[in-house]
C-alpha cells in the first residue's frame, strides 16, 4: 500500500499543471556581441581582414511556460536582441561602412531542467529575422553609396543558467548564437551567412 501511495504521489508531481506555478517571465540582459573576422576577397595583401568590434548589446525577453514538472519546464520565449554600435575595421576605408546596428527577433522553445531548484540550466532553439542598419558614412568619412537597411532570416540556438535570487527574481547568464545573413558592407567575403555570438547576464522576473 505504501508503495502504491508513493507511486501515485510521484506520478502526480510529474503532471502538476503549470498553471499552479508562475507561468510568465520577463527578463533584461546586458552583454556583448562577438563576430569572427572575415577575409576580404581581393583585399590588400598587407591586411585583407574585415574585423568587428564587440558591440554593447541588450536583450528583452518574454517567456510563457507551456508545460512542466519538477524535472523540466518547456516554455515559449521571444528574445529581442539589439546591438546599437557594431564597429567595423578594415584596410579599405573608402568602401566599408564605419559600423551598423543590428536587431534580432527569434521566437523559440526553451527547455529548463529542474525549474523549481535554486539552479536551473536551459537550452533554447528558434528562428525569426535579423535586421541590420548600416551606417550612412564610410570609415573614411564620406557618404556610404551602399544599402543602409538589410533584413534576413535568423536561426537562434542558446544555452544558459538561471539562479534563484530573491522572491520572484532570478539571475541569468546566457550564450546565444544568431546565425543570419550578412549586412551590406560593400565588400566580398565569400560568405553568405555569419554567426553573431551574444554573451550576457541579467535579471529575470517570474510572475
Predicted regions and their residues:
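Cleavable N-terminal export/targeting peptides
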Residues: 1-23
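Short, conserved structural micro-motifs that define repeat-unit consensus positions
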Residues: 59-65, 158-160, 170-172
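Strand-connecting loop/turn motifs
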Residues: 3, 21-23, 69-73, 116-120, ...
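Short glycine/proline- and aromatic-enriched beta-strand/turn motifs that initiate or cap beta-hairpins
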Residues: 20-66, 134, 198-207
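Predominantly the C-terminal beta-signal and adjacent terminal strand-loop region
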Residues: 163-207
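Flexible, solvent-exposed loop segments that connect beta-strands
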Residues: 37-51, 81-103, 130-151, 179-196
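Gram-negative (and chloroplast) outer-membrane scaffold detector with strong preference
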Residues: 56-139, 196-207
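Transmembrane beta-barrel strands of outer-membrane/channel proteins
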Residues: 28-32, 76-82, 123-129, 161, ...
